[in-house]
């Protein structure tokens, strides 16, 4: 054994882990690198041991003697806010870390004047990203200078560098962070963890490289979890189905500490609950609550899946009570394209004010309904019920905040052979950034895609950047790369003008080179232009060292809002309790589509995760706070055989917030799936009088439980 550290041994050497999305009046409840004085959840790091190989380290870890005095756990949201609830942080006097408020219009008057008022409580269960690759970190320290190099499976190496510098009190210039190829992130790696501090700290102490790789059990108990919320929703509705007001009291189970992006799910939920609907009056009170569970943070879509689920279940409940067609009720309340842009009167932490930019929500709905032939489904459903089969159709329409700032950087550089290198601050985990960014630059410079190399994920190579999260990479990072390419072309035309001794207005750009208009044989290729730009004394005064490169930082001008409608057709077998997804359809609007195949892949992957959360996945705890979902035998994931065919359509409503009209597409598939699937299950089980107010998981056992407790209806 080479080293042992505890919280006490590093108390004066490291600070707590940061949370960057706290509101000003929040109780910070920051996570210690190693537990200090109190352990607040199973899975919290207590000590670290270092050995020559992982087997010796595992054995040494068994020798660590921990003495704990048991404290009463608090796990449930309602229990956590009770007057006599045990406090996770006594100094705060409460388990509520913060409360987000929104007040739009006159909610009280709308409810007083409403023809109908509907109230429902919706529960969102706890599940998480569970990427194929768990987390890992490797650090080494440069002898003499003490400069740290950290390899980490992170979604934001530049922010990780900033956070590590703050926690260790080391200048950022003394830190290099490299994010190698990462096997999935989905938000779990968009957080900053204890191991990302401990590994470089130990490397510095030992003077040798130190590596840590998380196993699956560690991942399932220690890596941030997601989704768990409870929402008390009330809707004020006119007799014709117009939703006049929504009021919501919301709580998010944030677990035992406020992690890097802990407030974001609650903020997005409360800022976006009304989705694509007008609903002129709105009140939200959204609480972040501390409990003795693993900390909660962002997961693909953050608070959007919860918001879409609650709103779309509420719309179906209203339609059923009014005897209206579900699609027609949606159309009646949807914002039209002529009403955009639309200031919603809310805001989202780290993003800004919610002002819907572009879209055609009713058309998106109609296109999705056509994909699965909604018009004929009622007849199909009656015929199937006569045969003893229970099928249902579900709809979920939503609007999604994408392209979150503050900025992203890109450098575009041409070498003497005409090959192009793009350095981007965005970092991929399988989204296809390399293809997308190369395509944007190649299209602008009119060169072959194979001639463009994209480099990402190294803070020494790319000194400035933000990272990959919040469906921002194409719209922010891609825009930076495209603008960089535009500047390279502008410079190339200046060089060509001098070298060919013509005015710039007499030149045109064609097929990766500058040529004289009307005389295509008089031209310079991109590589020749790069050589001319760097040749000593070859350019007039003021243009010396005029390299054919450009670094561009694209600032987000606002939030670009994507939207979609998901539709699902399911069958529920009352005898076995099995839910089968028969067909699935998505019409997605992410503005200008750069690569349809990649967008489809993102949508399909998100739908798969939505199916997983709705039918299979759940983090379960016992009454003492012990996690019970600690292997993939207990935490179930969807298999290929569980996936339906997914019909995908695209609607393009370019945003005016960047020059190319792009919006984000990375998270949308996961946003609409829970709402569409649960609405479909509820539709299938309507003859049994089943009421669904949770997003899942709808396992066979859960379906049987619901059927036993339900009262059959006359339908």
What are these regions (language model features)?
Residues 1-95, 117, 272:
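Flexible, low-hydrophobicity surface segments
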Residues 8, 169-174, 204-210, 239, ...:
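C-terminal catalytic domains of large/alpha subunits in multi-subunit enzymes
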Residues 14-19, 60-63, 130, 152, ...:
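Short acidic, glycine/serine/threonine-rich loops at helix termini
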Residues 36, 133-138, 230, 392, ...:
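Short glycine-rich loop/turn motifs
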Residues 37-38, 171-179, 202-215, 219:
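Conserved catalytic cysteine-centered active-site region
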Residues 107-168, 393-425, 431:
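Conserved beta-alpha junction segments in alpha/beta enzyme cores
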């Amino acid at each position: 054994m080479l080293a042992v550290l505890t919280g006490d041994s590093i108390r004066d050497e490291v600070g707590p882990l940061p949370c960057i999305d706290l509101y000003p009046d929040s109780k910070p409840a920051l996570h210690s690198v190693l537990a200090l004085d109190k352990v607040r959840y199973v899975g919290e790091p207590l000590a670290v041991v270092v050995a020559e190989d992982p087997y010796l380290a595992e054995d040494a870890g068994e020798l660590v003697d921990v003495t704990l005095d048991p404290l009463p756990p608090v796990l449930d949201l309602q229990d956590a806010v009770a007057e006599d609830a045990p406090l996770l942080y006594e100094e705060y006097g409460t388990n509520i870390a913060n409360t987000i408020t929104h007040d739009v219009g006159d909610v009280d008057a709308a409810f007083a004047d409403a023809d109908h008022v509907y109230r429902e409580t919706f529960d969102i269960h706890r599940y998480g990203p569970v990427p194929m690759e768990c987390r890992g970190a490797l650090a080494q320290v440069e002898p003499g200078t003490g400069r740290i190099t950290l390899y980490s499976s992170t979604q934001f190496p530049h922010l990780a560098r900033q956070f590590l510098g703050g926690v260790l009190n080391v200048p950022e210039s003394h830190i290099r962070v490299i994010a190698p190829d990462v096997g999935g992130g989905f938000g779990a790696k968009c957080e900053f963890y204890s191991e990302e501090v401990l590994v470089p700290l130990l490397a510095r102490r030992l003077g040798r490289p130190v590596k840590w790789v998380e196993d699956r059990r560690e991942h399932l108990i220690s890596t941030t979890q997601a989704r768990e919320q409870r929402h008390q929703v009330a809707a004020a509705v006119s007799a014709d189905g117009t939703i006049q007001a929504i009021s919501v009291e919301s709580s998010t189970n944030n677990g035992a500490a406020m992690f890097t992006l802990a407030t974001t799910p609650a903020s997005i939920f409360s800022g976006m609950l009304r989705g694509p609907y007008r609903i002129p009056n709105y009140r939200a009170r959204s609480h972040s609550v501390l409990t003795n569970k693993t900390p909660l943070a962002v997961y693909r879509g953050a608070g959007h899946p919860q918001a879409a689920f609650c709103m779309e279940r509420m719309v179906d409940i209203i339609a059923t009570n009014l005897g209206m067609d579900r699609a027609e009720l949606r159309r009646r309340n949807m914002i039209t394209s002529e009403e955009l842009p639309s200031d919603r009167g809310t805001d989202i932490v780290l993003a800004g004010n919610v002002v819907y930019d572009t879209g055609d929500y009713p058309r998106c709905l109609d296109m999705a309904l056509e994909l699965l032939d909604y018009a004929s489904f009622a007849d199909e459903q009656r015929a199937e019920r006569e045969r003893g089969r229970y099928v249902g159709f579900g709809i979920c329409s939503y609007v999604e905040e994408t392209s979150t700032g503050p900025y992203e950087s890109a450098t575009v550089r041409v070498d003497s052979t005409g090959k192009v290198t793009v350095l981007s601050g965005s970092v991929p985990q399988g989204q296809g950034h390399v293809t997308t960014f190369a395509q944007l630059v190649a299209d602008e410079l009119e060169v072959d895609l194979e001639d463009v190399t994209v480099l990402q994920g190294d803070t020494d190579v790319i000194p400035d950047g933000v990272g990959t999260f919040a469906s921002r990479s194409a719209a922010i990072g891609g825009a930076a790369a495209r603008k960089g390419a535009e500047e390279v072309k502008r410079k190339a035309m200046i060089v060509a003008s001098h070298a060919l001794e013509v005015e710039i207005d007499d030149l045109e750009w064609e097929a990766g080179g500058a040529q004289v208009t009307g005389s295509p044989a008089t031209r310079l290729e991109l590589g020749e232009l790069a050589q001319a730009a760097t040749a000593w004394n070859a350019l007039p005064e003021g243009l010396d060292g005029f390299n054919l490169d450009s670094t561009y930082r694209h600032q987000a001008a606002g939030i670009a809002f994507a939207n979609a409608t998901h539709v699902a057709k399911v069958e529920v077998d009352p005898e076995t309790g099995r839910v089968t997804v028969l067909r699935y359809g998505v019409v997605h609007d992410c503005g200008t589509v750069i690569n349809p195949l990649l967008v489809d892949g993102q949508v399909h992957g998100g739908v798969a995760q939505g199916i997983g959360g709705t039918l299979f996945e759940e983090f379960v705890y016992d009454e003492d706070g012990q996690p019970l979902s600690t292997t993939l035998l207990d935490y179930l994931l969807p298999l290929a055989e569980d996936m339906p065919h997914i019909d995908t359509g695209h609607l393009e409503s370019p945003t005016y917030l960047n020059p190319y009209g792009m919006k984000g597409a990375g998270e949308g598939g996961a946003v609409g799936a829970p709402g569409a699937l649960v609405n479909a299950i509820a539709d299938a089980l309507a003859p049994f009088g089943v009421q669904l107010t949770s997003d899942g998981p709808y396992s066979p056992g859960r379906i049987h439980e619901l059927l036993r407790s339900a009262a059959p209806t006359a339908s």
